[in-house]
């Protein structure tokens, strides 16, 4: 083949590739966004009597409320409690969406959060989520997106088990025992020791300086 023939073949290949690679003018890449916790679908302030049941895909917000009765959260439901008092147990069932419990207290009520999909925040040690008073046990089990339990007064025992993506238990005053098992990674205390009236056991929580 002569040089001119080679050049024509090369030009033809380049033209074909150009036709294949040309994208339409409307081509765009869709943005990827994280799934956010739902906004409040029900907000209660002031006094309320009776058990509260939060359904899936609903978010209950208690803001400066006095709730006389238990609070139960179904799978895919969410709960935010700020500046409130709950007389009764607070129970979040496996598959719930998220929990914030800040500057609040329970009266004769345990707090149990199992199998949460989103973050769990029960006190933060700063003004973003101030100290809570919990008149009962705290159970945090199999939550998937991180757990923070910090600077709280807890009248019962604390159990943290099988939580994923970071567990912080920091600066709490716990009247009962502190038990930690199968959390991944093992819990940290953020450099602030917990005061524990009962026994300490499991993972890093067994150490007296934790």
How should each PLM-predicted stretch be described?
Residues 36-82, 207-210:
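N-terminal segments that cap or nucleate solenoid repeat domains
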Residues 55, 63, 68, 74, ...:
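Feature marks extracellular polysaccharide-active and adherence modules
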Residues 1-3, 11, 23-43:
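C-terminal region of N-terminal signal peptides and the immediate post-cleavage residues
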Residues 37-51, 122-125, 133, 144-210:
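Predominantly polar beta-repeat domains that present long G/T/S/D/N-rich surfaces used to bind, process
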Residues 4-18:
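Bacterial N-terminal signal peptides that target proteins for export
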Residues 18-26, 51-53, 57, 72, ...:
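Hydrophobic alpha-helical membrane segments, chiefly transmembrane helices and signal peptide h-regions
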């Amino acid at each position: 083949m002569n040089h001119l023939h080679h050049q024509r073949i090369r030009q033809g290949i380049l033209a074909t590739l150009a036709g294949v690679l040309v994208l339409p003018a409307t081509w765009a890449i869709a943005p990827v966004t994280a799934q956010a916790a739902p906004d409040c679908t029900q907000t209660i302030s002031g006094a309320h009597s009776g058990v509260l049941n939060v359904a899936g895909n609903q978010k209950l917000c208690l803001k400066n409320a006095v709730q006389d009765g238990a609070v139960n959260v179904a799978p895919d439901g969410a709960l935010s409690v700020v500046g409130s008092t709950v007389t009764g147990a607070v129970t979040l069932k496996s598959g719930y969406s998220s929990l914030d419990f800040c500057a609040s207290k329970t009266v004769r009520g345990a707090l149990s959060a199992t199998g949460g999909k989103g973050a769990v925040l029960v006190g933060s040690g700063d003004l973003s989520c101030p100290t809570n008073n919990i008149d009962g046990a705290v159970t945090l089990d199999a939550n998937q997106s991180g757990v923070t339990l910090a600077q709280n007064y807890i009248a019962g025992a604390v159990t943290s088990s099988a939580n994923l993506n970071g567990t912080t238990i920091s600066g709490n005053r716990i009247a009962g025992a502190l038990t930690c098992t199968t959390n991944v990674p093992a819990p940290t205390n953020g450099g602030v020791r917990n005061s524990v009236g009962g026994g300490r056991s499991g993972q890093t929580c067994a150490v007296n300086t934790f």
